[in-house]
Structure formats: structure tokens, C-alpha cells
Curated annotation (Swiss-Prot):
Lipid modification (GPI-anchor amidated aspartate), residues: 484
Organism of provenance: Trypanosoma brucei brucei
Record carries keyword RNA-binding: no
Protein name per Swiss-Prot or TrEMBL: Variant surface glycoprotein ILTAT 1.25
Domain of life of the native organism: Eukaryota
Glycosylated sites: 141, 371
UniProt propeptide residues: 485-507
Annotated membrane topology: Lipid-anchor; GPI-anchor
Lineage: Eukaryota, Discoba, Euglenozoa, Kinetoplastea, Metakinetoplastina
Amino acid sequence: MQSQQQPVFISIILLAINTDAAAPTTAVNAREFGLLCTLVRAEDNLEDRRSAGQAAKEVVALAAKIELILANLKHIERLAAAEPEAAPKESRSDETPEACKASKATVCSQAAQTYKTIRPDEKLALAFLAETTGDLRSTFNVTLKQITAAAASHARYFGENTESRPALDKIKKALYGSPEAKGDAIIESGDGTRSAACGNTDGNAANSAAKRATAALICLCGGDNTNTGNDACFTQTTADINYAKKGGEVERAWTEIRQKCKAGAAANKVTAAQLKAAAAELAALIHQKRGEKAVAGLLGAAQINNGAVDCDGSEANGKGSCVILSTSASKYKVETPDWLNALEAAIADLEQEQIELDNGRKAEAQILALNSSXTTLLAQAVEPTKQPPAKAAAAPEKKSNPQKDCNKNTKKRDCKEGDGCKWSSTEATEGAFCKPKDGEGQTSAAGAGDAGASDTEAKKCSDKKKEEECKSPNCKWDGKECKDSSILANKQFALSVASAAFVALLF
């Protein structure tokens, strides 16, 4: 096994002997460059924080105004009726409710403008609700309050919170440090050499490159006055930095790197998932152990030998365009750079945004459902205003009986079915046995004659004291005595009518 490794080891030694100090000439840091460019692009092109739909926002705004209108309807009506240039003037304090005084006057004026756009039937409904204290008004008020409360609980999602975006603030902190450093200040004035800014395992870990990602990118990609035309990230940089003087060179180098990062990807929004993936891969690269010394804390390309690693920008043994975040004295214990901590904090904020988004969507659905309920309640309030005055119930028309007076027919031959009459006796051919066929009563000149006939029939039945004697068609045994069956039928009908009336009252 050792004999197979020897040629490789010798070739590395020969390479180290024969290579002059120069900047890297291939895209050895393309991977690290791409990962950090995700952070650079996020500064200006981070995926927008999503918010509620326009329909839900309008419902929330309208609910607050309707609640104000209901509580101050008379005043809102006056404002709505006034000319725009004439409203609102507080001529008398007793005319203006507290909810519309001083700084609140503008809100009431806006509510009045909304009131103007409401349909006439809805205005009638609001007037009805404003004057009633019943369950309908109470339920309507509760529904309006639920809408405004749901929006208030998710103020950022409904666009009512205008504070800066925490995730974006932390992305800027990752790029420029805290306090923020731009221009030549990206590389601190105390970093008079590239090794001081970018790190050396035998001396100190990176200073500027550990504080801000912009400096880390310059260490990975930039040229300097000793190592010009660096190709470690992209084809030859044109801004070479004199770390001892700087003089605008750091700012020029950063501008060039920033432009290269954005080239070809300017239109694409950076997502939380992309930032999270980039942060995870950068952390893995930093903690990866390399070479026989198991050097950790190295970001970027360097030719690792048995000795130190110096990120001085040259392409030579033990050197490279890199960032070192550990030292041999600390046994290569990695110190996580400030910019990576800030990036991970930004990702945590974006994850919190997603939680707020999920909860906000639920609130939005609830608000739209509550709006449907409020619309239904308003429609119920419209109904009483549409009802015409109740008219007195007309007395039922008394049907005229087209039949002939059957009672006048005392002979069976004159009692004809064609006249609506029926002979009730099966034995007699003469007598008072001609009756209306359909059972309806008839008017007669005597009037009292019918009553007399009924009384007679009832008396005939009551004379029968035994059940076996109570066999006449007009008689019926009720358990104790023989009674006229028509009287029993009338009592049964009266009882059923009374029962139906009671059931109707219950429901």
C-alpha cells in the first residue's frame, strides 16, 4: 500500500518545489463562491413575505367600519350627507360622538364614505340593527369583533405591521457585520496583510473574514498586489487589493464580486430553503478535516502539507485563496464565523415567517367564513324592513249552497240525488227523511227547524237504554249510553283542532 502512495507524495513535493507564488488560475473555489452568492443575492432578492389576499384584507377593513357605523349611525349619516368640503366640522360637542372626535374624526369620515357605497336595502338593515338590542344585533356585533380580532392576532400577515423584516436584517448582518461595514471598511484597517484578514493556522485565525461574509468572499476570490488576476472563483479579477493601503481597492473588489454573484440569477427569488441548504453546506465545509494534520476550519482551496496553512492568496505549498477559522495552537478547533451565525438566525426567522404564514392562512379562511355569516345576518336584518304591514285576516266566505232545500221534500220520489239530496230511511216513503247528500247544512226560512230535527234525533237515541237497541244509523253507543253520532263527531273534530293549535304554538 505504501509503495502505491509514494509516487503521489513525490509528485506533491515536486509541485511544491517547482511552483512559483501566484494566484490560483482555476475555479478552485467555485463551490464556496456559489454558496456565499446565495446570501449576496438574498440581500436584494429574498422571496417576498406572503400576506393575506386582497379579499380578506377588504373584509377586515369593512368590518371595522361597519362596527363604527352601527355604533354611531346618526353621525355617520350626517357626514355622508354633507358635501366633502363641508365635512366634518365639530360645531357642537353634543353632536359628535366620542368615537369620532379629534384624531378619530378622519376614521369616521372614511366610514361615512364607505356608508355612501352601501346598497339602500343594506342601509335599511343597518338602521334596523342600530335600533335593536336583540339577539340578531348581538350576534352581528360578535361576528364583526371576531373578524377584527383574527386580523389583529396576525397583524403582519394582514399587512398591518410595517416593521422591518427581521430575516432581512440578519442577512445584512451576515454580509456586512455589526456594526455594518461597507466599502473599504469590509477589510478592517488593522488587517494590514491578506493573512491577517483571511487567517493563518500558525498565527491567528481570520479577522475580517470571520466577521462578515463580504470579507470572506474577497479572501476566496480577490486578487492582491502580490497575487494578481485571481481565477479561484471566476475568470480573472481586475481589482487587486493592496492590504497595507487599500485606497478604494476593497470597495472595487467587492463591487466586482457582487456583480458576478448576481449575473444570470437576478430574476430568481432566493428562498428560505436555498439559504438553509447553503448554510448547511458551508458549515459542513468549515468542519471538514483535511490533510494529515486533520486541519478543520478551512474554507476554500489550499495546498495542505505537514505544516501551516496560510491564506495569503498565493498558489503554493501550504497556501491558497481561503479563509482559516482555526489555529494549530487550538488544535484546529473551529470557531464558527459571525456571518454563519447571522445566516442561521436569518433562516430561523424565515421558518418563523412560515409558521406565521400557515396560521395567517387559517385566520384568513376563518375571516372569509365569518364574512359569509355576517352577510347572512345582514340579509336577515333586511327582511323585517321588506315586510308589508300585516293585514287583518279576512273572514272566510260562506259558501252558497247550490242545492235545493232537501228538507222540503217529504216524499221519497221528490228527494232526488240530482238535487244533492238523499232519502235517509230504508222503510218509510214519506216523512222528514230527505237530507243533503254531502252532509252540509242548509239555510232554511224557518232556521230553527233543523235544530229541532237534531234535538229530536238526539232524543230518539237517548231513549235507547241498551247497547243492542242502539242500532239506528244516527245513533252510536259511547260506552255508557246511546247518543246521536253527529254530536260525537263534532266533539272529536273540536278536540283535534285544539291539539293542532297547541303543537303549532310549540314550534
